[in-house]
Amino acid sequence: MTANEFRELVRTVSNWGRWNDGGRRGALNHLTQARTAAALRLACTGETVSLSQPLRTEAGLDMPEPADHYMTMLTDVDVGSGSVRFAKDYVGADYHNEGHSHIDAFSHVAFDGLFYDGKPEGSVTAKGADAGDIEVLRNGLVGRAVLLDVPRARGVRWVEPGEHIFREDLEAAERAQGVRAGPGDILLIRTGHARRLSELEPWDTREAKAGLHPTTALFLAEREIAVLGSDTNNDTAPSTTEGVAFPIHVLAIYAMGIHLLDYLQFEDVVPRCEAAGRWEFLFFAAPLRIIRGTGSPLNPIAIF
């Protein structure tokens, strides 16, 4: 895609000024209270399944910046509580990096000096984000999730790194699974990334990964998707968009005000969907209340 074609696409799908809310919620406006209430009916058995990767603390080709985890207190420390002893630990992560399950806030991606809805690039400083922070989701993210399994629809084990997923793939997955993504939905796209990592040797995922083609932004806009997630960071690597390394991040976050869920894992939930004969479920996630944060680590839960 040429630079001019990309900028025209950005203009076409832009939601700037659409809801007259100062750019606070963006496409979350599609996820109304009524739609959240309707999604609760998808919880029938009470079974829950994590959609998160484990928080990894060891480096690898696919995990260049692992989380820090160390003990700050062991039970051999007498804290003056008699026979009661405590263990404590510290956890820290640069969670926007490869392999960490997380959510991106609007303040995570700037393009041409601006964030979503025209907020200036300078609104994010060393102290954090003055606008577009993750606090907008302090009450949680609850709604109907639709999982589209692209490798399943293609009849392959996974989408190869570097390959694009197109609108036609999403529509084919809908037909194969008997489901349709619609207004206010949390759309989840499985590429099979985690399966490939588990069955083959790890590789530098910064250099090659499967993801959405930029033109799928038209699908997201037409269906009025509220949140988008994938088992990669949603973008294809390497990018084939002239001058733009992360076109889906720009289109979704910067242009459309769609929060992104990166590096989820769907290998546990796919068998449950197959057994139930449905690819929709109640989705729940509670981002950390990081004041002025550009996102949050995340452990989303599918509820059946």
Model-derived features: where do they sit?
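Active-/binding-site microenvironments in catalytic and ligand-binding cores
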Residues: 1-304
